[in-house]
């Protein structure tokens, strides 16, 4: 069985997987991601944000449910409190002149907050900046910390491995339900995802 261990809910670094087969990105794969042919999500594309020189072109904050047993529901949150945390981070970005893109997760019960840079910057600088935004965002809404914040991509400061994979947005099947979509301040999917 050559199915990705992550699809079987097994935690494993991609570079350590005996089944890894790095494949070239093709137009067919991009179309499959955007259309969503496969119910099991095996046509979903992801990206390693950490570049070989230790830089990155974007930063992603992942907000989801990391309670015990959450993997059974694809880490979907069970209430809407996570939206307050995402909104706090969004506000901190906007106060500092940054226009983040917020993506509702595939399940519709979590989010990715994307910040793109004009040029590659050291991952350590991006991550320190991200932690500062989280700290300021938490204090702006009187939180001791973000409960639903799970991790930041890239997850490493330096390129000693390929890093962690982040699923790309606009996944065809999820998008049909308004998920895996970029959303506005009212949590509505933008009508034209290509014109944001």
Predicted feature descriptions by range:
Residues 1-109, 116-132:
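Signature for HUH/AEP ssDNA processing cores
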Residues 44-83, 118-196:
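DNA replication initiation modules
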